[in-house]
Amino acid sequence: MIAMLTVLLYLALILEPRTAVQAGHLPKPIIWAEPGSVIAAYTSVIIWCWGSWEAQYYYLDKEKSVNPWDTEVPLENRNKTKFKIRFMTASYAGIYNCYYKSAAGFSEHSDAMELVMTGAYENPSLSVYPSSNVTSGVSISFKCSSSTLFGRFILIQEGKHGLSWTLDSQHQANQPTHATFVLDAVAPNHNGTFRCYGFFRNEPQVWSKPSNSLDLMISETKEQSCTPTEDGLETYQKILIGVLVSFLLLFFLLLFLILIGYQCRHKNKANASVKNTQSEDNAELNSWNPQNEDPPRELCTPR
């Protein structure tokens, strides 16, 4: 009986963090790597975990490792902490997540973050067909090839878009191992620098050195060049608004002139009617002339 209680107590101590994580209602932490999640071999990287002001300890878990993989206290007056890796090696490559502990219990785990090490193998070569300068809407093919028998290749677009494509490698007799990435109907957002890497299936976070870079330039077709861009559309809208305002001002000005003209004509008609009335009165007065009448005769004869 005592042995059974001891086993149950041991299991409770082991499962306590997991159970608390599932039952907790604390804010979910956020994990990220600096300067990035794809790191060259033997360079340093910092894994950040952002959680809560109430956090007392932060825990970092690594997939397929004894967890917690690392533990840190919060930075002074901060709601986050950092886990330092001074020299990146293949043993640090993998999938990580973090969580924290507060007086209220354990938080849930953050989203998973994949930390990749590059430089473990020789670099593959990258080529593009038909050209690195094409018009929008055209299909192009990137070919990543290597003499190393990689199981998979990954094509990455560097920069703000951060697009990536992964394919299984193709093996043919007397030819390098390769993978062909087809981009149908390329668009301006595909502009940028591309590189590819090779890796083995059993170590998906341990990559080769980067291939040679290829700069892809996508130009617009004639039809697309006639289509206003966002900046062009904004300018077009401003011009259209200005034209409409001008038409409205001209309309109100014309309406004002019409009203003024109408009032002037109405006033002239009123003045003309007054003048006609005065002319008729003058005519009646002029029609009576005392010289045209006989002088009045005297009723009495002189003595």
Curated annotation (Swiss-Prot):
The keyword Protein biosynthesis belongs to this UniProt entry's keyword annotation: no
UniProt topology in membrane: Single-pass type I membrane protein
Known glycosylation sites: N79, N133, N191
Sequence ranges assigned to domain Ig-like C2-type in this UniProt record: 42-123, 124-212
Annotated Gene Ontology cellular component terms: cell surface; plasma membrane
Cellular location(s): Cell membrane
Membrane spanning stretches: 239-260
Positions with biased composition (Polar residues): 275-292
Cytoplasmic side: 261-303
InterPro entries xref list: Ig-like_dom, Ig-like_dom_sf, Ig-like_fold, Ig-like_Receptors_ImmuneReg
Documented effect of changing C226F: Abolishes mast cell activation and homodimerization
Reported tissue expression: Expressed on mast cells (at protein level). Also expressed at much lower levels on natural killer cells (at protein level).
A Pfam family matched in the record: Ig_2
Domain of life of the organism encoding this protein: Eukaryota
Extracellular topological domain residue ranges: 24-238
Keywords, alphabetical: Cell membrane, Disulfide bond, Glycoprotein, Immunity, Immunoglobulin domain, Membrane, Receptor, Repeat, Signal, Transmembrane, Transmembrane helix
GO BP field: mast cell activation
Ranges for region Disordered: 275-303
Function per UniProt: Plays a role in mast cell activation.
Subunit structure: Monomer and homodimer.
Descriptive protein name: Leukocyte immunoglobulin-like receptor subfamily B member 4B
